[in-house]
């Protein structure tokens, strides 16, 4: 796609699942990819896999809930690869529980990862983008943040916050050459979803959910990188502040 070759991109949560698929695709498009994740073994593997294909990638270990750790990781990536042109905020975590069965410690962990984490990364990276007059951001939220999701009250609140954050920053930063958009995945075959659907009862729920999806399947990580690449490309230069659902038709809006 136009405008991706030789750009630098930072992908949080890029060691596994959707993030790894995004990292691979953007490397194929000619980007220099920085993978920011806590899983060092998987992150090194993805970076090595990309490099083995003749593309450019590096792994940078950081906990996105730690502002200083994020700042150091971004500094390390930029020192080696140049200023960040693109940011994909993808990292996230959840565990399915009804809200009344949860406690404040659980809320804090979910909020730290799914809301404060992207806030930390965005605050560090967007300063440079605004100063340079160019930047593109794709935030990976969730349809849980648009329409709610039983068993994911706090996670849904965080993802709704990311949607609102994206729209607000799109307004604040458009004059500085920075555009931001949100992708909201529906149910996707990742470690998080599989943890929700364990056991016989989980299998029953999974089959019912698939029947509710017009395409009759869960998403897979490879369903998202093409849209991410488009939103970062020059072909999407007039698109900002938008929220796009990718759910096989489970949720429709517009």
Predicted regions and their residues:
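The beta1-alpha1 cofactor-binding region of Rossmann-like NAD(H)/NADP(H)-dependent oxidoreductases
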Residues: 40-41, 61-73, 104, 222-223
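Substrate-binding pocket helix/loop in short-chain dehydrogenase/reductase
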Residues: 98-99, 106-111, 209
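Active-site loop immediately N-terminal to the catalytic Tyr-X3-Lys motif
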Residues: 100, 147-153, 175-176, 216, ...
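Active-site helix of classical SDR
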Residues: 122, 158, 166
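Alpha-helical segment proximal to the catalytic Tyr-Lys
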Residues: 127, 171-175, 237
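Residue(s) in the substrate-gating loop at a strand-loop-helix junction
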Residues: 142
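Short C-terminal tail/terminal secondary-structure segment
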Residues: 147, 229, 240-254
């Amino acid at each position: 796609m136009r405008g991706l070759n030789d750009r630098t991109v930072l992908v949080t949560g890029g060691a596994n699942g959707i993030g790894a698929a995004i990292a691979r695709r953007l490397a194929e498009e000619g980007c220099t990819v920085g993978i920011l994740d806590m899983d060092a073994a998987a992150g090194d593997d993805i970076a090595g896999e990309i490099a083995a294909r003749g593309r450019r990638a590096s792994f940078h270990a950081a906990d996105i809930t730690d502002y200083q750790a994020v700042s150091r990781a971004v500094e390390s990536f930029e020192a080696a690869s140049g200023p960040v042109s693109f940011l994909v905020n993808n990292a996230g975590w959840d565990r399915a529980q009804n809200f009344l069965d949860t406690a404040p410690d659980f809320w804090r962990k979910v909020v730290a990862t799914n809301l404060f984490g992207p806030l930390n990364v965005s605050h560090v990276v967007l300063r440079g983008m605004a100063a340079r007059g160019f930047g593109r951001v794709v935030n990976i939220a969730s349809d849980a943040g648009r329409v709610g999701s039983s068993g994911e009250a706090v996670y849904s609140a965080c993802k709704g916050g990311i949607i609102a954050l994206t729209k607000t920053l799109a307004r604040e930063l458009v004059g500085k050459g920075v555009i931001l958009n949100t992708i909201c995945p529906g149910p996707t075959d990742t470690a998080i979803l599989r943890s929700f659907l364990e056991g016989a009862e989980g299998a029953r729920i999974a089959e019912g959910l698939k029947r509710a999806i017009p395409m009759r399947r869960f998403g897979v990580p490879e369903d998202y990188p093409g849209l991410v690449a488009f939103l970062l490309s020059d072909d999407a230069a007039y698109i900002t502040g938008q929220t796009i659902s990718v759910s096989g038709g489970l949720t429709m809006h517009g």
